[in-house]
Each structure stands twice: as C-alpha cells, then as structure tokens.
Amino acid sequence: FSSLFKINSLKLNPGDKVLLERGSVFSNQFLQIRDSGTKDSPIVIGAYGEDELPCINTNGQGIWYQDYDNPLDSLTHVYRGYVSSSILLYDTEYITVEDLELTNKGNDIIGELYSCIDKMNRTGVAVVAKDKGVRCGITLRNLFIHDVNGNVYDKHMNNGGIYMTCFKPNNVELTGVPRYKDVLVERCTLYKTSRWGIAVGYTYAHDKFMGA
C-alpha cells in the first residue's frame, strides 16, 4: 500500500494481512481498524521488504472521540474528548500489529507546547474495548514508538505510546463487561511519549474500585 487512507476503508477478514513496504514513510496518516480476526486466523498489520521499518508520522491526524460516559472521581479529571492516534484498534480482537515505526508530534506553531493544558490528546497505539465484551488476542510486537506529544495533564485520556482502555458499553446486559484477555506486548521500544509509555485504563468503573 502506498497510502493508508485506502486501508481504513477496507473490510478486513480473518487471515488478512496488511503489509507496508519497509523504507516507506506515511506522513499525516493513520490507521483505524475495527475488524477482527479469529484465534486460528488473526488479522496482521505489518511490513514487507528488507529496508527500515515503515514509518507512520501522524502529526495530530487520525482523530477519534473518547468518552468514558461516566464522570470520574474528581471534577478536574477529563473523561471525554478528541484523541489523535497513529493506530486505533476499536473493539477488535485477534489482531497483530508488528514491525512499524510510529510518531505523533505536536505543533509548536499553533502553541502546542509541552505543558499546554489544552494540548491535543495523542497516542501511538490506542486499543479500545466497549460494546463486544471480552476482546482476545491483541498482539503488539516490534513497534518503535517515539515523539508522541500528548497532553501531560489528562491522565485518564489516551495519551502516550500505547494506551488500552475499556469504555462504558451501550448495553452491558447484552454484551457483558468490556475487558481484555491474552494481550501480548513484546519487543517494543518507546521513548519521548507523553503522558505515558504503556498504560491500561478501566476508568469508567472507577467507583467500583475506589476504597477497595
């Protein structure tokens, strides 16, 4: 693929492989995947060739809306808003993302300095579980994630290198509680990622854990 925009419009099926050519650079682009593989036939997002890792420089694109649909334990904590992610895996399972370089830089020209309180939330990889219960078989392997200039204040929003969250489902009686099973993160290198390196959030149900 020479552009990621076509990939975002594809319907991916179990066993499909989306391979980016090594040495290629995708500026102001992103991937948003909402399809799932199976245990025996996972979807693979990866690379081919012999050069450097293919690089996705998102630069604040790939915007989606995060909403825990539940106020947090402090009125000062932000629980909903827009997020920019190089790769978004939304309610997917049995998917492998490997052999990629990801950046998501801020823009000093419009005032996105390190400590700007209104800075865009940013991640390298965002993984979300919401309306399909248990999400299994998420593998992130050999990713080089750096220069992700997220918001250092909004700790419950998706900010950092890799951020996995569970959101309040629309119908918990029908779908069950969203959660993950069999998650593997291996041989990933992260640096200069704010606010977090690798983080997991289950914040929508915070009231069930406070004081436990």
Model-predicted segments: where are they?
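Right-handed parallel beta-helix
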Residues: 42, 46-51, 93-104, 133-149, ...
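Extracellular beta-strand/beta-solenoid scaffold signature
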Residues: 30-33, 61-88, 111-131, 153-180, ...
